[in-house]
Amino acid sequence: RRSGVVDVEWGNLNVRARPSTSAAIVAQAPDGAPITVLNTANGWHLVNYNGTIGYVSSEFVTLT
């Protein structure tokens, strides 16, 4: 488990139900939002964002 911060140039980071860009969006996290990284695999982080568990692309999270 690691702490991270959302780092997007525009809009929000989509938190998805599965590690796929076609998966359903379960939450959206704004730039600078704190996020907890639970696991990482194949370019995706499994995260807890405000109590919602889902997947985000690892390129848009800066680990702290």
Task: Enumerate the language-model features and the residues they cover.
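Short, compositionally biased
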Residues: 48-59
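SH3/SH3-like beta-barrel fold
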Residues: 32, 45-49
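Short alpha-helix capping/helix-loop boundary micro-motifs
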Residues: 19-24
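SH3-family beta-barrel domains
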Residues: 1-14, 27-31, 38-41, 58, ...
